[in-house]
């Protein structure tokens, strides 16, 4: 990972909670990443999570069953339409969800917001998210990073997940890393195998440094 330089400014309780948006295509590993982050960070930070699905609250259920956080700290949002719209053009349903969660948990340090599965053009409204993490996966093919799109080129952190599948799909991780650097410039990225927890610590380090969290 090409990590950002640490900041001398530290986030305190006087600052609003950090809002971290997690986006990416269906099946890339967004919910798994959110689960791993919650489990790894919940003993140090006060966390709440909001998930987006079009017609169900399946991701909320999955996180609850996995024990990522207590049930009352996970809210599911049914967007009823394009998942991109609910995090960008009209984020009101998610902004309302954030307000409701912070009314319940006013001391929250981090609000995680997982978008519904979307395409490479998905981005979060700056009103909704302070940091954006975009998740793609190796199973989508070696070419994915060079396809571009705001999720790949403009997200604060790009996560390339399921590195363990590279031999099975004929993907060269070195090529993917090179293409990622060409598309993102100095913006950081992390290669992960979330099921084995590989790379999770790097994602957490990014959130803590870039999000000005006290540690």
Curated annotation (Swiss-Prot):
One of its GO terms (molecular function) is GTPase activity. CDD domains: UreG. It is found in: Cytoplasm. Gene3D superfamilies: P-loop containing nucleotide triphosphate hydrolases (3.40.50.300). The keyword Cytoplasm applies. Keywords: Chaperone, Cytoplasm, GTP-binding, Nickel insertion, Nucleotide-binding. GO terms for biological process: urea catabolic process. GTP binds at residues 24-31. The keyword Kinase does not apply. Signal peptide: none annotated. Its main location: cytoplasm. GO terms for cellular component: cytoplasm. InterPro entries: CobW/HypB/UreG_nucleotide-bd, P-loop_NTPase, UreG. Facilitates the functional incorporation of the urease nickel metallocenter. This process requires GTP hydrolysis, probably effectuated by UreG. Homodimer. UreD, UreF and UreG form a complex that acts as a GTP-hydrolysis-dependent molecular chaperone, activating the urease apoprotein by helping to assemble the nickel containing metallocenter of UreC. The UreE protein probably delivers the nickel. Belongs to the SIMIBI class G3E GTPase family. UreG subfamily. NCBIfam families: ureG. This is Urease accessory protein UreG. It comes from Burkholderia cenocepacia (strain HI2424).
């Amino acid at each position: 990972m090409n990590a950002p330089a640490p900041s001398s400014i530290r986030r305190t309780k006087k600052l609003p909670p950090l809002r971290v948006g997690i986006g990416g295509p269906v099946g890339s590993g967004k919910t798994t990443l959110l689960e791993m982050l919650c489990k790894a960070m919940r003993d140090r930070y006060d966390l709440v999570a909001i998930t987006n699905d079009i017609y169900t609250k399946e991701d909320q259920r999955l996180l609850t069953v996995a024990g990522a956080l207590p049930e009352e700290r996970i809210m599911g949002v049914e967007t009823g339409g394009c998942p991109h719209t609910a995090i960008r053009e009209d984020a009101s349903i998610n902004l309302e969800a954030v307000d409701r969660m912070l009314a319940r948990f006013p001391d929250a340090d981090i609000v995680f917001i997982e978008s519904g599965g979307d395409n490479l053009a998905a981005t979060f409204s700056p009103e909704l998210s302070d940091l954006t993490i975009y998740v793609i996966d190796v199973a989508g093919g070696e070419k994915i990073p060079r396809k571009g799109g705001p999720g790949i080129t403009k997200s604060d952190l790009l996560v390339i997940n399921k590195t363990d599948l590279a031999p099975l799909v004929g993907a060269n991780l070195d090529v993917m890393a090179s293409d990622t650097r060409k598309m993102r410039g100095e913006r950081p990225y992390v290669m992960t195998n979330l099921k084995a927890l590989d790379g999770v610590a790097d994602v957490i380090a990014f959130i803590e440094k870039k999000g000005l969290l006290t540690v």
